[in-house]
Amino acid sequence: MSNELQLIVGIEMHCELKSNAKAFSKGINGFSDTANVYVSPVDMAFPGTLPIVNKKCVGHAIKMAHILNCQIADVMQFDRKNYYYPDLPKGYQITQCTNPVGVNGKLEIPVDDKTLEVLIHDIHLEEDSASLDHFAKMTTIDYNRAGVPLLEIVTEPCFSSTKEVIAFLEYIRDCYRYCDISDADTKKGQIRCDVNINLKKDGKYVTPRVEVKNVNGFQNIEAAIKYEEERQKEAYLNNKVDELVQETRRFDEDTNTTISMRTKEDAIDYKYFLDPNIPPYKLEKTWIEELIKEIPALPFERKKHYMNDLGLNDYDASILIKDKNIADYFEKCVIIGIDSKVAANWITVNIVTELNKTGNSINDFYITPEMLKQITDAIKSGTLSSKQAKEVFAKTLENKKEPKEFISKDNAQISDEETLRTMIKEIIANNKEQQEAYLNGRSNLFDYFVGQVMKQTRGKANPVLTKQILKEELKK
């Protein structure tokens, strides 16, 4: 048995779903800086209003349950989670407790050189609460967020490092985006996590479990775990475990610390029961099968294909799969005949750089795979050098014209052997002294002759062919 303390983490990951309507109303599911513009009577719990289940959100939930290898429920049913808080207009939240859409899942993800097995307790669909805005002398309620559809993934306590946690969260985020289930934008608060943390030694828990609620952003999640791990370690090593309590804490972004909210003794009894306004209904197997067929190739599947079948290295493959649209662009390039390594290099080096500069999506990028092929074909045929190709790439973006407009005789690479050989013979004839010195051991003069050729051709001479001919002619 190890004498070291082991970090144990479980995650409850909430993600806002992509849908025109809210989870249980026809209210618009949108983001606005103006308060209370996306609300409906159902969202604000007006008397006499009844919920209606958003079928699209149920479909999203089923897809994610399948991705997580969960056992998918035969019957869809919803419960009421009862508690009072100003941001909860109904006095309860519609969620799933007794029969989640998916249970007992398992996911394997690579972390460094190992494979991490993540056990999924359940995945369930629920609605979000309203948001409170606190001011000096008052607090206001914004109902825009009330009723926004959320999907919550609950893991078992199976993580032993922040690296494992972030790897899992990033993978799930990418799956949401690949399947068009959510934009999963942490900057907009579309992903929030409750993080459960405690320590083990010799296979036994030695500190009480602490839940850090509602942490937004992967950096904050990592910081919260690291702080809580150190806080509990310090208490254990100084024989102060008795001072630790099972409690709920919140993360303070300003200090990168966690702050106590309530202890187990103050925990809320939510008194879950089946929502009488939403009768349970059967999930048709044919519909579930149709949904599963819509799931595209996921990030790690594509990465494996890119590395094993297309010969890409880990770095390039990892960059390509980060964005589904970039991966789609790459695959279109390969389909139309661009060499996979050439396409990957242009995308990861040139195109991604341009996208980062502008902040645009590759869907809005001017150069299509077909245009990129014009450039790569010109390099392959010797019409353009790599340097000239980059210039054509830049001119294409700047002028919004086809690359072929700039691949002309005026800027084409000189690759005709007879033309180059005649020119090189003339240059050597005019530099006999340098030729003699080169033949007597001053090998660095070879670059001098290359420079003379490039100067005379204004950089258009094929560099490979130039060096080949120079080696032959300098010996004569």
Which role fits each region the language model picked out?
Residues I336-G337, A343, I351-Y366, Q374-I379, ...:
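M16/insulysin-pitrilysin zinc metalloprotease superfamily fold
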Residues N3, G311, V334-A343, T383, ...:
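Structural motif
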Residues M1-A297, D314, I335-D339, V349:
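Basic, nucleic-acid-interacting segments
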Residues G189-K201, Y270, M307-E331, S340-T358, ...:
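Core structural elements
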Residues D316, Y329, D339-I347, M371, ...:
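Residue-level detector of well-ordered alpha-helical segments, enriched
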Residues E228, C333, W346, N350-E354, ...:
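Amphipathic alpha-helical segments in well-ordered regions
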